[in-house]
Amino acid sequence: MLWNYQVATPPYLYQEILANAGTMQNKGLEIHLSAIPVQTKEFSWTTSFNYSTNKNKLVALSNEEFQLKSGYIEDGWTGEPIQQYTHRIFEGGEVGNFYGFKTIDIDSEGRWIIEDKNGNPKPISEQQAEDKKIIGNGLPKHLLSWDNSFTFKNFDLGITMRGAFDYDILNYPRMFYECPVNLTRGNLLATAYEPKYGKTVLNDQQELQYVSYFIERGNFWKIDNITIGYTLK
């Protein structure tokens, strides 16, 4: 696993070097099935299905030569004006974990209530770094694809579909444009004035925050491609 490590100078020319010092473990399963369910003189149907699942683990971030004392790395970036890392990867943990404050409610003044390190409610104004926790994972646990090909006389039809399941996404547009404080900075989504947790809208002085409220399920199933053809004879 590649990461930037602090090194001594000399012998190295620079104080930081990109090195492949980490160790990653992946365990998974892939299944592929194909069949011709129907085949006659004028009509045929060929189908294939693929399924895969994978579980990863960051075994180590350091080796004998390159050391990372923290035991974790932070990656992803919200950008201005929030300016926070979105992911933290621990030794012994999974890659792709969203790491931040877990919102559990909103108070009567429209300010977030988060869960502290012990699982108790706390106003977000009293947030501490140790209150952050894993709030989702952006890597799909299940990947599927289904391809179908049909022929009828000189006509042919192909349909390709795929899906990904059991993973999360960070909804950036909502995180930035669903907070009334942004009205003085630009546009807002219509949902900015919808009650949060069924109670009240966000306070127009509530600063933009990277919190679990904007983490959503990313599950999808879509048609990637449809082709129709005719063969001249």
Predicted feature locations:
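Transmembrane beta-strands of outer-membrane beta-barrel pores
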Residues: Q25, A35-P37, Y51-K57, F152-N154, ...
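Extracytoplasmic gating/loop element in the C-terminal half of outer-membrane beta-barrel translocons
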Residues: A164-K233
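Flexible, solvent-exposed coil segments and beta strand-coil junctions
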Residues: Y5-E16, N120-E130, T200-S212
